[in-house]
A protein has these predicted regions:
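N-terminal small-domain helix-loop-helix segment of the aminotransferase-like
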Residues: 1-35, 42
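Glycine/small-residue-rich loop that forms an oxyanion/phosphate-binding "nest" at active or ligand-binding sites
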Residues: 31, 35-41, 136-145, 149-153
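Short glycine-rich anion-binding loops that position phosphate/pyrophosphate groups of nucleotides
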Residues: 36, 61, 108-112, 168
């Protein structure tokens, strides 16, 4: 109904039910955003600070870099390996240890290479430095069907955030609706920099 403000709880309940086959999600482990780009921007606004390190791969989704630049962060990248664009897991791990990045973005599957890391590989990277926040961008996850959501425990892996959206997988790019999944304390913190009604009722209903 467009005469009242949008209500997010029904959508959160749907998302919780959607993943019941793998594990139970709580409403407070889910954030709702006006598209995945808004989620990415909110994460940088919450956790990115001047001169801190932002680690990602090259090439990858282009919106990460301007968000990091707006926060004055220093970007470090690792290039994919060879003609098959293998993930540089050893170099990436070494740079986590050496630079202790504040934010780590992994597009999985990667845009534009299609490179995929397993859930365990991502969890292993997150365990290297517990004070580094790893953001897993899963916008294209439905094309390979291997989401980290199927196995993660946000109480244990509390330095991992997962971003998903309905733009690519459901053909709803024009409605702008994105989600973050993570430890409830992280989600609550990110919600403080977003408006209470950023996502419109049409997008929620869809």
């Amino acid at each position: 109904e467009i005469s009242i403000y949008p209500e997010y709880n029904l959508l959160k309940n749907f998302l919780c039910d959607k993943y019941l086959d793998s594990r139970k999600f709580d409403n407070d482990e889910i954030g709702i955003f006006n598209g995945a780009d808004a989620a990415i921007n909110a994460i940088f606004n919450c956790f990115g600070e001047k001169d801190q390190i932002f680690l990602t791969t090259n090439p990858t989704f282009g919106y990460y870099s301007p968000c990091s630049e707006m926060r004055g962060m220093k970007k470090i990248t690792c290039s994919y390996i060879g003609e098959n664009f293998l993930f540089p897991i050893e170099e990436f791990s070494e740079k986590i240890i050496k630079y202790n990045p504040k934010l780590i973005f992994i597009c999985n599957p990667n845009n534009p290479t299609g490179t995929v890391l397993s859930a365990q590989e991502i969890i292993n990277l997150a365990n290297i430095k517990n004070d580094s926040l790893i953001i897993v961008d899963e916008l294209y996850e439905k094309f390979n069907g291997d989401s980290l959501l199927e196995s993660i425990d946000f109480e244990k892996n509390n330095n991992i955030l997962i971003i998903q959206s309905l733009s690519k997988t459901a053909g709803l790019a024009g409605l702008r609706i994105g989600f973050t999944f993570g430890n409830k304390n992280l989600i609550n913190y990110i919600n403080k920099v977003t408006g209470p009604y950023d996502v419109n009722s049409f997008a929620i209903t869809a």
